[in-house]
């Protein structure tokens, strides 16, 4: 039994996430976690809300709430909507937890002992009208690299370049809109990433199996030359900067930079998980001197998070010289776009997770987002493509097959798996086809190829329809009941198999199919011995057709949703 540690990029606390956030980290991580559990592997899927930094303060101010109260409320909302989508986190933590406070402060102290932290007098943007220093995300302006006029002070969302606020052209305060800004001296701590460049490059070189997207972003930053990164900010909300047990002199009004503490929350959230359950040991997942050397660690994230996870967080982990588990596979995703533009939390552009569930069940969204996962390139969402994927794949292929064979069994065999007859050449051909396709599906799932996995799964659904059409039990029943029994028995086993292999992608519908066959749940991943798998249900078992699994999306609904959410504007 393997041990699989899975983390997905922490969603910001500033509101319910849109479908782009879901598609690029949490959903594919969930699919992978469900697959690994089904294979019997010891699997731990960790996520958390990212609660520090400017987004939290700005969102709380806009909501008229205290920031701590706002974060607590939003954490519950994000947890609940994630669960409603079927996200099977083993723990969904909070970066504001006491565990993350202690661990972040610990890393800073250890890094300083290793000569990788330095106090510097920095020049920061100060807003005269707001009477305060402006952290990165309190400043927007024009990107010096691509000319995008809404670049943030830490990163340009258009070209992806990491920025320093002083690099922005024509900057202004996000708080007041004031351009009455000046640069003043302030003291901050810096992580000396320049000292770690060779070690980070060697570490990335040691992972030749990483996808091109992740490696190309990492090497781009290394080739351009790493910069030392400020890890403290002039903010009130965040993790206090300490020296030993006390506030660090001169840093009493400062906190750690959100991108320093947020990845550390992966470890801290595992501590939270362990603290909440007897017999749980977080160190065996994260400390290689305590058993984590046999863990396979897989991270999921959007491409805009890759730089921080391949440079800054490794600089923290490797620089500490402590035996922490580092990532084995980093799975990055391109962007799911909204009609050619971006989904946007701040601009409320696109469909958000809570609104999505108001109009359709979660499996509809899960299937579309995985079968169209933005892996090799950006993917554009359109209502027409969404409806086509749901109607074609779920309703016409999977739903049609399950409904046809169960209804036929109810009508011709009293809803009982029939005895009689023996498999013939058509079944032998089916066994070979299903075995090969199961092997392909398992291989793609193991490789974390989300889109290819969905394609392999759909191909297996198609096989069932083709078999049923060719075998034609409705014809065989008229002259050869034993032959009809073989076909029905085989097809019912195939439908039960579909429940098991579809569960990582569409868990709610898969469970309904499983209930029709009284399958134990959660399911076990099948072997590639199709002959055995397609004869595993006991003869005489009562089966029943579920309610309509997938109701087709109509043109009128598309028109309504386009009016409500927007579309091809």
UniProtKB/Swiss-Prot annotation:
Record's cofactor remark: Binds 1 zinc ion per subunit.
Pfam family, one: Anticodon_3
GO aspect biological process, one term: methionyl-tRNA aminoacylation
A GO cellular component entry from the record: cytosol
Motif 'HIGH' region location, chain numbering: 11-21
Motif placement: 'KMSKS' region: 342-346
Cofactor (UniProt): Zn(2+)
Subcellular location: Cytoplasm
Top-level division of the source organism's lineage: Bacteria
Catalysed conversion reaction: tRNA(Met) + L-methionine + ATP = L-methionyl-tRNA(Met) + AMP + diphosphate
Principal location listed in the UniProt entry: cytoplasm
Residues reported to bind ATP: 345
UniProt-listed Enzyme Commission number(s): 6.1.1.10
Annotated positions binding Zn(2+): 143, 146, 156, 159
Any one Gene Ontology molecular-function term assigned to this protein's record: metal ion binding
Keywords annotated in UniProt: Aminoacyl-tRNA synthetase, ATP-binding, Cytoplasm, Ligase, Metal-binding, Nucleotide-binding, Protein biosynthesis, Zinc
Subunit composition and interactions: Monomer.
Role summary: Is required not only for elongation of protein synthesis but also for the initiation of all mRNA translation through initiator tRNA(fMet) aminoacylation.
Family from the record: Belongs to the class-I aminoacyl-tRNA synthetase family. MetG type 1 subfamily.
Name this protein carries in UniProt: Methionine--tRNA ligase
Species name: Caulobacter sp. (strain K31)
Name of encoding gene: metG
């Amino acid at each position: 039994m393997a041990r699989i540690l899975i983390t997905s990029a922490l969603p910001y606390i500033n509101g319910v996430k849109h479908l782009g956030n879901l598609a690029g980290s949490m959903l594919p991580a969930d699919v992978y976690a469900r697959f690994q559990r089904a294979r019997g592997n010891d699997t731990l899927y960790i996520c958390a809300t990212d609660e520090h930094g400017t987004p939290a303060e700005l969102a709380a101010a806009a909501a008229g709430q205290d920031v701590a109260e706002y974060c607590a409320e939003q954490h519950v909302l994000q947890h609940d909507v994630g669960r409603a989508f079927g996200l099977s986190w083993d723990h969904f933590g909070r970066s504001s937890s006491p565990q993350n406070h202690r661990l972040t402060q610990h890393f800073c102290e250890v890094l300083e002992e290793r000569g990788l932290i330095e106090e510097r007098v920095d020049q920061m943007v100060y807003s005269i009208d707001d009477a305060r220093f402006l952290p990165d995300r309190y400043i927007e302006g024009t990107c010096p690299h691509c000319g995008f006029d809404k670049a943030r002070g830490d990163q340009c969302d258009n070209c992806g370049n990491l920025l320093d606020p002083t690099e922005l052209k024509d900057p202004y305060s996000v708080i007041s809109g004031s351009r009455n800004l000046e640069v003043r001296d302030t003291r901050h701590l810096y992580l000396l990433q320049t000292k770690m460049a060779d070690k980070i490059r060697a570490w990335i070189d040691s992972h030749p199996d990483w996808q091109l997207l992740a490696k190309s972003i990492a090497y781009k930053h290394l080739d351009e030359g790493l910069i030392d990164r400020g890890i403290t900010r002039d903010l009130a909300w965040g993790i206090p900067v300490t020296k030993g047990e006390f506030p660090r002199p001169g840093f009493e009004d400062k906190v750690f930079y959100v991108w320093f503490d947020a990845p550390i929350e992966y470890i801290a959230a595992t501590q939270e998980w362990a603290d909440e359950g007897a017999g749980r040991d977080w160190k065996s997942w994260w400390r290689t001197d305590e058993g984590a050397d046999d863990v396979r660690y897989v991270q999921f994230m959007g491409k805009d998070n890759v730089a921080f996870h391949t440079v800054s967080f490794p600089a923290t982990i490797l620089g500490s010289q402590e035996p922490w588990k580092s990532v084995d596979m980093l799975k990055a995703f391109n962007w799911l776009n909204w009609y050619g533009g971006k989904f946007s939390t701040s601009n409320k552009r696109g469909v958000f997770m809570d609104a999505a569930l108001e109009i359709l069940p979660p499996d509809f969204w899960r299937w579309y987002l995985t079968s169209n996962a933005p892996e090799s390139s950006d993917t554009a969402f359109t209502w027409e493509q969404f409806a086509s994927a749901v109607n074609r794949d779920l309703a016409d292929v999977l739903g049609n097959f399950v409904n046809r064979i169960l209804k036929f069994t109810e009508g011709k065999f009293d809803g009982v798996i029939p005895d009689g007859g023996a498999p013939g050449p058509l079944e032998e051909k089916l066994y070979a086809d299903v075995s090969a396709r199961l092997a392909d599906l398992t291989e793609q799932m193991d490789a974390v190829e989300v889109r290819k996995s969905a394609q392999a799964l759909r191909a297996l659904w198609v096989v069932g329809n083709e078999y049923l059409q060719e075998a034609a039990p409705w014809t065989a029943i008229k002259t050869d009941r034993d032959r009809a029994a073989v076909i029905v028995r085989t097809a019912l086993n195939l439908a039960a198999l579909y429940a098991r292999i579809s569960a990582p992608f569409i868990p709610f519908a898969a469970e309904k199919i499983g209930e029709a066959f009284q399958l134990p749940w959660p399911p076990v991943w099948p072997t590639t011995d199709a002959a055995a798998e397609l004869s595993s249900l006991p003869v005489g078992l009562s089966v029943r057709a579920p309610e309509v699994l997938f109701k087709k999306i109509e043109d009128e609904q598309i028109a309504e949703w386009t009016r409500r959410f927007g579309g091809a504007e």
